């Protein structure tokens, strides 16, 4: 990214603020936006009053924590071949709450892949990539969505 592009970074408003303790709600919002336009279809594009502040130095881009949804109630995801090793992860899930597990993974500086369950049968794949400074939380849907509800 050149120095000219640096000043053009803009932070936009989100409906559910990215927070480690409400990751289940954010996942639900993203799935609803993709499947149904939900209740704020105009909130996806940036408008004049959606801009909160100009971004800081955009050259400081760090590695991220990646969270992927691969199964959820009422929505079938197909063509998803991800299936990581499970041993240590499920031991951590039984030992700690899900929020504690997320914050624990967020603070560490090693690569870790984990599958754990959230409320309403939603399963999350968490992969922690080594970071330099702070990490961002990205949420994406793994596979294609099929709508077979009548």
Swiss-Prot record:
The keyword Transmembrane applies. The keyword Membrane applies. The chain crosses the membrane at residues 15-35, 51-71, 73-93, 110-130. Its main location: membrane. It is found in: Membrane. It is a multi-pass membrane protein. It comes from the Eukaryota. Keywords: Membrane, Transmembrane, Transmembrane helix. GO terms for cellular component: membrane. Partially overlaps IMA3. This is Putative uncharacterized membrane protein YIL171W-A.
